[in-house]
């Protein structure tokens, strides 16, 4: 028989939004249950260096920051469960979440499931996934020590991946479909310095057309330039860094979405993190397509916990 566990508050996700919500909910004596999801710690576990977390003057790694957040949540007796939710039912209360290991019910839910790496959708990209194609330089970069690699993208993620790989690979070719990058100025300065050293090669106004390879894995990449011409690169690895997609497919048909993101109430009158179903709140990248920073996610997690506390207090007062 499948175990059914009930909690007043369940938090889905273990990134900055989830752990921040857990700290505040636990301090409010709501005894939250946090379900980690498949990637415990969220996107930051794949980030090498976090230099903009206030108070950490010398910076720290993403995994180290997430470990500290986990410890902080556990200090206030947040129960953390390593499970993956594959179905939800918000049609009736208590809300039901079905996981791989158990079934969970709750009076209130905070969704902090974050976002996942986006891919180009090329057949060759999928064919060589795990055989030379990756979306995480910190996870897979060590396989390419002293080997040539390519990074695709033009934002912060792409530049950060290229800078990281420049310390490992023989050369890094950064492929961007435009003439200029969208990354932060400090990252652009670092990028230009590595370009001057010859460690990073810029290939602008070009798109990845096909990943080339054989039975052993990736051997190259074919690029289509904006003028219609083609070039080929000899690389052993291709890293895709073109952004992320919110992890909301689980909630389609049950919560209101816009462009894949959960719609929250917003505003300055409280209940800003409320979704289209009462008692269900959202925080972090799952509801934010603009800022998408660790610190804004953590702040939204705090807001969601406070909104949840007020919601549960209202339920309790109504029943008395």
UniProtKB/Swiss-Prot annotation:
GO biological process, one term: removal of superoxide radicals
Enzyme Commission number(s): 4.3.1.9
Annotated InterPro entries: FAD/NAD-bd_sf, FAD/NAD-binding_dom, Ferredoxin-NADP_redctase_2, Pyr_nucl-diS_OxRdtase_2_AS, Thioredox_Rdtase
Pfam families reported for this sequence: Pyr_redox_2
MF annotations from Gene Ontology: glucosaminate ammonia-lyase activity; thioredoxin-disulfide reductase (NADPH) activity
Record: residues binding FAD: 36-43, 285-294
Coiled-coil spans in chain: none
S-S pairs: 136-139
Gene3D superfamilies (alphabetical): FAD/NAD(P)-binding domain
Keyword entries, A-Z: Disulfide bond, FAD, Flavoprotein, Lyase, Oxidoreductase, Redox-active center
Other facts noted in the record for this chain: The active site is a redox-active disulfide bond.
Function, in words: Catalyzes the conversion of 2-amino-2-deoxy-D-gluconate (GlcNA) to 2-keto-3-deoxy-D-gluconic acid (KDGA) and ammonia.
Protein family (similarity comment): Belongs to the class-II pyridine nucleotide-disulfide oxidoreductase family.
Name of protein: Glucosaminate ammonia-lyase
């Amino acid at each position: 028989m499948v175990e059914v566990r009930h909690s007043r508050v369940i938090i889905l996700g273990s990134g900055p939004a989830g752990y921040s919500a857990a700290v505040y909910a636990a301090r409010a004596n709501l005894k939250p249950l946090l379900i980690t999801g498949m990637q415990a710690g969220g996107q930051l576990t794949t980030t090498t260096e976090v230099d903009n977390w206030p108070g950490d003057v010398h910076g720290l790694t993403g995994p180290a920051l997430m470990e500290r957040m986990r410890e902080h949540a556990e200090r206030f007796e947040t129960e953390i469960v390593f499970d993956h939710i594959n179905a939800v039912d918000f049609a009736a209360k208590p809300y039901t979440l079905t996981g791989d290991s158990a079934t969970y019910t709750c009076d209130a839910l905070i969704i902090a499931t974050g976002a996942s790496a986006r891919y180009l959708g090329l057949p060759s990209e999928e064919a060589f996934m795990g055989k030379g194609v990756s979306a995480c330089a910190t996870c897979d970069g060590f396989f390419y020590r002293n080997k040539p690699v390519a990074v695709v993208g033009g934002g912060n993620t792409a530049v950060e991946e290229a800078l990281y790989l420049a310390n490992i690979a023989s050369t890094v070719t950064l492929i961007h479909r435009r003439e200029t990058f969208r990354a932060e100025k400090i990252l652009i300065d670092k990028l230009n310095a590595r370009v001057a050293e010859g460690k990073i090669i810029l290939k602008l106004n070009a798109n990845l057309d096909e990943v080339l390879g054989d039975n052993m894995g990736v051997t190259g990449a074919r690029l289509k330039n904006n003028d219609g011409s083609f070039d080929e690169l000899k690389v052993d690895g291709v890293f895709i860094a073109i952004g992320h997609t919110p992890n909301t497919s689980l909630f389609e048909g049950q919560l209101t979405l816009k462009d894949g993101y959960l719609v929250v109430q917003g505003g300055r009158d409280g209940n800003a993190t409320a979704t289209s179903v009462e008692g269900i709140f959202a925080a972090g990248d799952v509801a934010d397509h603009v800022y998408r920073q660790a610190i804004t996610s953590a702040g939204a997690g705090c807001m969601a916990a406070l909104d949840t506390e007020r919601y549960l207090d209202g339920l309790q007062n109504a029943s008395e």
